[in-house]
Amino acid sequence: MRSKCKTISIIGAGASGCICAYFLLKAGFEVSLFDYGSPLRTLLPTGGGRCNLAHAEYDFKELAKNYPRGEKFLYSVFSKFSTYDTLALFEELGVETYTQENGRIFPTSNSSKDVREKVLKHISKAQFIKEGVTEITPKENGYKLKTDKAEYFFSDIVIAVGGNKIINGLNHTVIPFTPALVGLNTDITTLSGVVLKDVYSIDCKLTDDLLFTHFGISGPLAYKISSIKTKDAFPYKLCFDLYKKEFDLQKLLNENPHKDLKNILSSIFPHRFAEYLSGEYAEVKAHKIDGKTRDLILNKIHNFEVNITGTNNGEETVTAGGYDLNEVNPKTMESKLYPNLYIIGEALNIDGFCGGFNLQNAWSTGFVAAESIINN
């Protein structure tokens, strides 16, 4: 009976769209998934190809703190579908998981491809329509949906498409899309491959690993910073404390009087970085380092300045921007402007840090929308 009462279209066959389809199909509804590309293709590169499904944070308010945009909106969402529910979902789908020490949750297969195949197996009854949706027009008792090839009519629409794929015909406010979770271009290009552990960003009050690349900086800390500072105009400066642990540089100098400064600093940092940090004093013996030089090096360590000139958009995995959260009901994911129209996952102006948080948003909002459609 349900499938005859409702005709449901999901626009976007990414993580949120496919999981929404899973719950709707499970409840007996017929679902049409629109996407010009292969379903779940964006899942394949996640977690470095290993698919970081979620993060082991089980308090919904603490979990929501990992989203620079969307924290309060997600309180209601995560209270309905938490990390516990995500683990139960993937167990149901036949995906076994494990948790790393840093809290990141992965499939035991360490394969995004394996996760994709299992999800698609469970939504095989959906109608996959390989067309791009260009316009949605509200009609009596539903919506006309226009693609690049044809026109369709559905009683319920779920928008689950992200990036710059704007759909015409609706009066929703869409926040412009900007790169998030990307590497940052700097004028430091000689340290490619160097990794510094537990670096503290003084500007953003965050601690994580920092990777130097051929274009500048990357890795977890750079991604978090890029997500927070999406609206900052280039160029801007960042300041880092490279080593927050207590240490006595003068004591190290006294204990190693005949060692070069670069070799002494190599006991704290990777050798190439120690040499870079030492600068013109790299080969000066410790016993010749005076107080002024010592303080100069200490200031570099605890106030390391980097000039940010842009983002490395070729590395882009997540965008900030999307449908304005003020126009979406977080308890149902239904539009406040149009009945029976839902907006989820990648389409929302929500972005999370690295570590499985963006996929958690996809699973949770996909479930909440499906639950609302089922109960409506």
Question: Which ranges hold each PLM region?
Answer:
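A conserved FAD-binding loop/helix module that cradles the flavin
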Residues: 162-163, 349-376
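N-terminal Rossmann-like FAD-binding beta1-loop-alpha1 element of flavoenzymes
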Residues: 6-33, 369-374
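Predominantly flavin-linked oxidoreductase catalytic cores and closely associated redox partners
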Residues: 113-114, 121-270
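Conserved N-terminal/central alpha/beta ligand/cofactor-binding core
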Residues: 41-127, 132
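Glycine-rich FAD pyrophosphate-binding loop
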Residues: 25-48
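Residue-level recognition of phosphate/Mg2+-coordinating polar/acidic sites
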Residues: 27, 59-61, 79, 85-103, ...
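Redox-cofactor binding/interface segments in oxidoreductases and associated redox assembly factors
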Residues: 11, 45, 155-160, 343
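Hydrophobic anchor at the start of a short beta-strand
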Residues: 8, 29-32, 97, 157, ...
